[in-house]
C-alpha cells in the first residue's frame, strides 16, 4: 500500500533494521563509508564528526546512497539512541582525539520505533501555534521527543 502524503525527511524510523545484518554493515563500510572518507582525505578535506548516510538496499541487496549529512538524521536518530548503552559523549570525545577505534559500542537488544506526529498540512502550509493534545504520556518503555514545539503563555503545548 502506498502512503499518499508529502514526504519530508521521514515520518518515522525503527531500529534495528533487519536488513542491516553484520554482513551488510561490513559491506556498507567497505563499499560506501570508507571510500567516502578516504576520498575526502585525498582531496585534503579530512573529516571528524557525524557522517549520516541515508541508504536504500535494492532488490538485489546492493546498498545505494540517497544522501549524506554531517549530522544525525531526524527522526532516525531517536530510535537508535534509545538502544545505545554506551556513553555518547565519550564516543564524541574519542573521535575528536582520533581514538574512536578504542571505544566499545554497546547496544541493547530491544526494538525501538519512532513515529512523527505533525500538524495537518505539514510540511507545506500548516497552522502554527495550535494546541497539541494528542501526545501520550511517557512510560518506562517510551520517550517523547519534541521538535518545533513550545509552551505558550498559558503553559499549553503548541
Regions found by a protein language model. Give the residues of each.
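Internal helix-turn-beta structural module
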Residues: 137-158
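Short beta-strand/turn micro-motifs at beta-sheet edges
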Residues: 1-3, 102-104, 150-157
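Glycine-rich phosphate-binding loop of ATP-grasp-fold ATP-dependent ligases
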Residues: 1-24, 75-80
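Short beta-strand elements
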Residues: 1-6, 53-57, 63-72, 148-149
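Detector for glycine-centered tight turns/loop "hinges" at secondary-structure junctions
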Residues: 60-61, 155
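Structural motif
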Residues: 12, 63-64, 112-115, 141-144
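Active-site "cap" helix and flanking loop/linker of ATP-utilizing ligase/carboxylase catalytic domains
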Residues: 29-43, 48-51, 69-138, 152
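Short beta-strand-to-turn element immediately C-terminal to the catalytic PLP-Schiff-base lysine
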Residues: 14-16, 57-58, 82, 118
Amino acid at each position: 500500500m502506498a502512503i499518499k502524503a508529502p514526504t519530508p525527511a521521514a515520518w518515522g524510523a525503527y531500529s534495528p533494521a533487519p536488513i542491516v545484518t553484520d554482513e551488510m554493515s561490513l559491506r556498507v563500510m567497505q563499499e560506501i563509508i570508507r571510500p567516502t572518507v578516504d576520498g575526502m582525505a585525498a582531496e585534503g578535506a579530512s573529516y571528524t564528526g557525524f557522517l549520516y548516510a541515508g541508504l536504500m538496499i535494492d532488490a538485489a541487496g546492493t546498498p545505494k546512497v540517497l544522501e549524506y549529512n554531517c549530522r544525525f538524521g531526524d527522526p532516525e536518530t531517536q530510535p537508535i539512541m534509545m538502544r545505545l548503552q554506551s556513553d555518547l559523549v565519550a564516543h564524541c570525545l574519542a573521535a575528536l582525539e582520533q581514538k574512536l577505534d578504542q571505544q566499545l559500542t554497546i547496544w541493547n537488544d530491544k526494538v525501538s520505533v519512532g513515529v512523527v506526529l505533525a500538524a495537518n498540512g505539514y510540511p507545506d502550509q500548516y497552522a502554527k501555534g495550535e494546541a497539541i493534545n494528542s501526545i501520550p504520556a511517557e512510560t518506562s518503555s517510551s520517550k517523547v521527543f519534541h521538535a518545533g514545539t513550545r509552551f505558550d503563555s498559558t503553559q499549553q503545548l503548541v
